[in-house]
């Protein structure tokens, strides 16, 4: 699926991630501060291959990737990771557009609910998700266990 949005300045396209996008996506994730010391983004890209690749979307403007969202679905719940838009393109509804695109794909797969994690001190992102109808799950505690160390 390709979604095209035209505005007065340029045409933006949402399409599936392709392997040749790797370097550009990694650079964008750094620019968007989506990289944390606890994960290896190159390994995340390799691990995504073969697991719901149709849910990994990039936003392209004039042949340059300016946004990403990585969705997942296990048949029970959906998950969203790596939602980000280049700082020069923020404030134009593009993150919301990417989020809606992956939500639509998840809905088409029969996904009843989406979960996501946000670092607790990332108030700007928390506000964004609250504006897009995501609610804090006060009745749930996120637990995690590392099975493979990313060095």
How would you describe each model-predicted region?
Residues 26-39:
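Helix-loop element at the rim of GNAT/NAT acetyltransferase active sites that forms part
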Residues 85, 91-104, 131:
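Conserved acetyl-CoA-binding loop-helix of GNAT-fold acetyltransferases
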Residues 64-72, 79-84:
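Conserved beta-strand in the GNAT
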Residues 47-58, 79:
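A short helix-loop-beta-strand connector motif used in the catalytic cores of GNAT acetyltransferases and
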Residues 12-24:
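A short beta-loop-alpha structural element at the N-terminal edge
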Residues 55-67:
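Conserved beta-hairpin
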Residues 99, 106-117:
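Conserved GNAT acetyl-CoA-binding A-motif
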Residues 116-125, 144-148:
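Conserved beta-strand-loop-alpha-helix junction that forms the acyl-donor binding cleft
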